[in-house]
Amino acid sequence: MVNFGKRLMADQLEEWKEYYINYKMMKKKVKQYVQQTQNGGRNREQVLKEFSRMLDDQIEKIVLFLLQQQGHLASRIEKLGEERALLMEQADASQISELREAYREVGIDLMKLLRFVDMNATGIRKILKKFDKRFGYKFTDYYVSTRANHPCSQLQQIFKQVGIVAVVGALSRNLAFLQDHQGNFPSIYDHPSITLKDPIIEQINHSVQKLTHATNLLQFIGQHALIIPEDMHSGSEDLVDDQSYHFMSLLLNLANTFLYMVNTYIIVPTADDYSVSLGAAATVCGVIIGSMAVAQVFSSVYFSAWSNKSYFRPLVFSSIMLFLGNLLYALAYDVNSLTVLIVGRLLCGLGSARAVNRRYISDCVPLKTRLQASAGFVSASALGMACGPALAGLLQTNFKIYGFTFDQNTLPGWIMCLAWITYLFWLWISFKEPDHIVRENSVNTPSSDSGHRRNSNLEDGLAQPFLIDAKESLDENGEDNDENEEDPEDSHKPATSLAAAYRLLTPSVKVQLLIYFMLKFAMEILLSESSVVTTFYFNWSTSTVAMFLAVLGLTVLPVNVIVGSYVTNLFQDRQILVASEIMVLIGIAMSFRFTSHYSVPQYVSSALITFVFAEVLEGVNLSLLSRVMSSRLSRGTYNGGLLSTEAGTLARVAADMTITAAGYLGQNSLLNVTLLPSFVICVASIVATFCTYNSLY
């Protein structure tokens, strides 16, 4: 294995040699600092100041050279533009072809500049990690907090990529114009949807896409789903291209997501009435609702593992289990069995294929459309969450057919039976197994892609976040061999068990998972007990409860649009995270019943605050989680999406069990008793957030 220092020397351009990071010198400095501090020759404050100044000098050297080279490229494009104007009058095809090649040469030089940025970014990441490890101090936290967000930050000058993107735009526009020397080709600025099919431009765009981490709406919503593209961390190549991508199969996965969320929430407004009709207490609704989440804890693991071999078969199995589960749920009333009802919900939980839906988007959708697909996953979930209760509110009827009861309690089961059998038929005739799955199943030995990887050497490593992820594995070649500093974490092999995945969790990741657990717990308490609480205090009907829950669900997408489009451009994610946690805490505190009189305005306003800011918190939390999580958790069975799903599912189980347990104290005490754990967990998550605040980048 070639260490990074040797690779840097081998790969750097000779004419740019003096402008690369002096990695060897800085590595020696780190060793000196360790020895000096151990001998008492220097204190930590002196070392931090000196090393910070040295790193500032290195970054400034890189930035100034980068700006200089961007200027040279801009000058060349300007001169070529003058030649283009003259050639358009002559319409000489051979000279136009030569001019097109000249533009492409500029593109090749731009690729070299991108490689320059990549090598230096990797060097800075590695020296920061080396300092943390050898010196025993979280220098990365200090350095990032004082440099990355400064108005004159040179780090932002590198990674905002404004100059490089402008050069790409100029190259694309001129090459597009030269495709039709009559000038009839539409401008890329007038028609943004038109993409230039030029190999150089496509390579540059792909590299810039990996290197740039600008905040935008699709990225925010896509990260909300915690669908972590493998190449966003490791630089590995896409498993799918435009030709093998099957849109209908993606649509079927999104439909599965939508129907499952409808299935989850359609029973919430009537679960308490159903349990009472079967002779149980109203608060047993917690068991009825939560049993689906209990089964999902296990189904998420086997579905995630199954998706390594197939996507079609897990979706078929999911549809069958959900059909059977809903059938039992609908029949439970006529057989007068609470056990049948709960078994039906357990079967529904065993049919949860959300892990497959996430995995399909991550592995089988081209990179350029993956964010849109991820946003579609979140949107389908939000729409299903709103449609479930709304649909339940419309099912206010009561009749019998051949002895089977159809009323507000059983109709959700019958409706979902029909929905899943229809979906299964659509799945059977329309789904296409991805090509790479077919190849892996038919060929025992994996095909070699070494040639392809050699061609993509420029992009190798561009995907890694620059400073936001100092605890991740930093480079496929690991730490320098001569120091024996490579951790097991630095391997790119995926985790092979939940225990192995847990060992990869840094304190920052653990805190983010705690926050995710907290917000899911608070939301589940709010939603699952809403029917019991509103009936007890306000005497709301099923239709009113359903409308209230539907309105809450409809806030999800607008909130994500506002946060993703505006708020994240004004504040850091970690600032939004803390503010949202505090607002959730305020919402929970407002929900407590302090006096004998509990009003509708108090309940509705506190519920809106809790739910809306929990949604904001979820988006920002998963966005941060996708950045601070190890690259080894971006793929394999035990991936980041599975861990977050398990954390959220366990939170739902705990919340529903809390509701049922609190029911033994009487409905008069239910509200305050169930809110108390939410309040305590929220306070704990806020404290934990402040403890890891400087590492949340």
UniProtKB/Swiss-Prot annotation:
Subcellular location: Membrane
A GO-annotated cellular component: membrane
InterPro entries, A to Z: MFS, MFS_Domain-Containing_Protein, MFS_trans_sf, SPX_dom, SPXM_SPX_plant
Topology in membrane: Multi-pass membrane protein
Record-linked CDD domains: SPX-MFS_plant
Keywords carried by this UniProt record: Membrane, Transmembrane, Transmembrane helix
Domain annotation SPX: ranges: 2-145
Protein name stated in the entry: SPX domain-containing membrane protein OsI_08463
